[in-house]
Design a protein with these regions (language model features):
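Basic/aromatic DNA-contact patch characteristic of tyrosine site-specific recombinases
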Residues: 1-139
Length: 142
């Protein structure tokens, strides 16, 4: 997934809410000189390099106008994205992102801040375990 980034934005609910989808340009000119359109734009946040927020980005979808928090990380020599959540004004914002990321970053990185486990893979494993538990519960109760 090749995604181009834009200028850094402040990690603040007001700064995120100020971004208006109508003001954004999703078009670009490719090497052949044709005008193409992106499905999303990605904006990195202006956060300290040594914080748990390192690699956090705001993804704005063209079709829906949704603002999503993504965490970009390197694991096994490859860049990957973890979807942290969707920005919902008044109920889900920067404080909730910090609360969700703290245990994930602590359990998936070493002392140097290098990723030792992928949060994407961990989430998939947890979902499979939950499905097995639900199947076992309903199979034993009937």
């Amino acid at each position: 997934m090749k995604v181009r980034t834009r200028s850094k934005i402040k990690f603040d609910n007001k700064a995120i809410d100020k971004i208006n989808i109508d003001d954004l340009d999703f078009s670009f000119v490719n090497k052949a000189g044709e005008v193409k359109f992106r499905r999303q734009l990605v904006f990195p946040f202006d956060v300290p390099n040594k914080s748990i927020l390192k690699g956090l980005k705001l993804c704005i979808q063209k079709s829906t106008g949704s603002k999503l928090f993504w965490l970009q990380f390197w694991f096994n020599g490859k860049a990957d994205y973890y979807s942290v959540g969707k920005r919902i004004p008044g109920s889900w914002g920067v404080n909730e992102v910090e609360d969700k990321l703290l245990p994930i970053v602590r359990s998936h990185t070493n002392d140097k801040g290098h990723w030792i486990k992928s949060p994407v893979e961990s989430e998939k494993k947890k979902a499979l375990e939950d499905q097995r538990l639900i199947k076992f519960y309903f199979a034993s109760s009937s």
